[in-house]
Amino acid sequence: MSNVDHAEIAKFEALAHRWWDRESEFKPLHEINPLRVNWIDEHISLAGKKVIDIGCGGGILSEAMAQRGAQVTGIDMGEAPLSVARLHLLESGLEIDYRQITAEAMAAEAPEQFDVVTCLEMLEHVPDPASVIRACATLVKPGGQVFFSTINRNPKAYAFAIIGAEYVLQLLPRGTHDFKKFIRPSELGAWSRDAGLAVKDIIGLTYNPLTKHYKLSADVDVNYMVQTVKES
């Protein structure tokens, strides 16, 4: 059975035309993107690296990594976001290989072909996140790095990521997230280790509603990112 939640795909398909509108529902992604890319680039210089972006959507992260000199492949199961991503290349002038394929199928096709794998804001949208993590581990070369980001599962995360972000501040459309699909760092760490990935770093991403700014933080109670390395 394919590890795809068609209802999740449909949500992002419906919004695809607004992906590059910085004042749209995707404004948070645009605002956190520089923080994410800088953090990744600090751990492994992206210039000249072969990178695959899992769940690339409209290409916000993929383009940012290509701008840093990476050779980027972006994969997603949403046809509409991929169309938007390809069209935006005409504006940016970047070269990125976008493909409609699952992480698992790509792993079977191209094992150990990438220096870096990114899987950001994606694991909480699939039925079996552990399967995606295994695919990421297969795709990356020995000694290569895999980066994940997702949302913690606890009362604070429910209050901030769903009640706060979707209902009070209306940063995201209602129904964007399902609390049951949120992932604790301990779970992500266990799945990573089972897949042969060693967790090396974890950092939180917090939002200040007064200043309307995001920053990297030691607080991993809500949004967080993880750096892992494939054991040689």
UniProtKB/Swiss-Prot annotation:
The chemistry this enzyme catalyses reads: a 3-demethylubiquinol + S-adenosyl-L-methionine = a ubiquinol + S-adenosyl-L-homocysteine + H(+); a 3-(all-trans-polyprenyl)benzene-1,2-diol + S-adenosyl-L-methionine = a 2-methoxy-6-(all-trans-polyprenyl)phenol + S-adenosyl-L-homocysteine + H(+)
**What is the protein's given name?**
Ubiquinone biosynthesis O-methyltransferase
InterPro entries recorded? SAM-dependent_MTases_sf (IPR029063), UbiG_MeTrfase (IPR010233)
The Gene Ontology biological process annotation of the record reads:
methylation
SUPFAM superfamilies attached to this UniProt entry: S-adenosyl-L-methionine-dependent methyltransferases
UniProt pathway? Cofactor biosynthesis; ubiquinone biosynthesis
| Class of the enzyme per the UniProt entry, highest EC level | transferase
Name its species: Stutzerimonas stutzeri (strain A1501) (Pseudomonas stutzeri)
Q: Which domain of life is it from?
A: Bacteria
* HAMAP family recorded: UbiG (MF_00472)
